[in-house]
């Protein structure tokens, strides 16, 4: 079994690849080569967002990757995201009409007539949040998004949708790794048929966002504690990244590693030649620190 053949159910008739290629912090001009290289390594899910400011480059990479592999569009799963606005940053929330227009703009930049999953990137829409969600449901009905979901939503945000009598999201993309396990949210999502997609799976790595100026809430204590994962990875004969990604897929979460190195791209796909044993899974369950670590400004789901 390999990652290209493994997927998790998203809707009754749509599955999401277990391992996708994340494109956050990949520059527009680097995206074509990165995405096409990832596809040549075997990735069949590409994750991007309007907020990443690289959709044009990602779209070019998709076209190159499909052509090089002799694949058609339906062989690839593409996720895009609406930036909902954020009043705290002086960015007015998108209205329902603006949400529809934003999706059209993303599709144009990507050079696609539809995406496989379209997400509201964060719950920052305030009183426009439900209008944004209704717009996503319209996009699904129109065939511009095969499935729709949210990102960084907590139980309260999801209950808002439920209380409005609207269909629940197909997926919620959230920060998930041994230091931020969100058991109550994950259980709620399972109860309501919302697929979990994990981002920032590699937070515990010493190299994760280690460059000066890269945003995170990672402390020196956390950096010191990361050695436990290197010891555990050595036990299985895998990299720390593979161990952390395997933790995600073993829990049923689609994961989204990013690398510009072809060797590591392939390595991050190789998650099904080993399994973390029950004792280590139990040990990792004790490492939960609660809120996310990915953002210095705090967990966006709060």
Segment roles from a protein language model:
Residues 123-302:
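Beta/alpha (TIM)-barrel catalytic core signal, keyed to glycine-rich beta->alpha loops juxtaposed to Asp/Glu
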Residues 26-39, 92-110, 156-159:
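Short, acidic/polar
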Residues 1-76, 202-205, 300-301:
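N-terminal binding-site loop/beta-alpha segment at the start of enzyme catalytic domains
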Residues 44, 113-116, 146, 170:
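Short acidic/polar active-site loop segments enriched in Thr and Asp
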């Amino acid at each position: 079994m390999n990652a290209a053949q493994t997927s998790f159910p998203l809707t009754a008739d749509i599955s999401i690849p277990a391992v996708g290629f994340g494109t956050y912090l990949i520059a527009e001009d680097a995206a074509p080569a990165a995405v096409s290289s990832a596809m040549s390594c075997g990735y069949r899910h590409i994750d991007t967002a309007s907020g990443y400011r690289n959709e044009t480059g990602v779209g070019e990479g998709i076209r190159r990757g499909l052509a090089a592999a002799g694949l058609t569009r339906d062989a690839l799963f593409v996720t895009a995201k609406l930036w909902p606005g954020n009043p705290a940053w002086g960015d007015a929330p998108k209205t329902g009409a603006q949400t529809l227009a934003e999706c059209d703009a993303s599709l144009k930049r990507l050079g696609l007539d539809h995406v496989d999953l379209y997400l509201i990137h964060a719950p920052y829409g305030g009183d426009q949040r439900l209008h944004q969600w209704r717009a996503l449901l319209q996009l699904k009905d129109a065939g511009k998004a095969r499935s729709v979901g949210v990102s960084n939503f907590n139980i309260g945000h999801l209950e808002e949708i439920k209380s409005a009598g609207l269909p629940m999201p197909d997926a919620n993309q959230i920060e998930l790794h041994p230091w931020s396990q969100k058991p109550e949210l994950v259980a709620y999502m399972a109860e309501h048929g919302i697929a979990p997609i994990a981002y920032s799976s590699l937070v515990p790595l010493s190299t994760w966002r280690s460059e000066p100026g890269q945003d995170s809430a990672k402390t020196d204590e956390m950096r010191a504690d990361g050695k436990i994962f290197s010891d555990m990875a050595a036990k299985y004969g895998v990299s720390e990244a593979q161990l952390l990604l395997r933790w995600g897929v073993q829990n049923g979460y689609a994961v989204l590693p990013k690398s510009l190195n072809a060797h590591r791209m392939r390595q991050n796909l190789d998650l099904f030649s080993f399994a973390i044993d029950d004792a280590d899974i139990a040990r990792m369950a004790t490492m939960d620190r609660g809120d996310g670590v990915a953002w210095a400004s705090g967990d966006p789901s709060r």
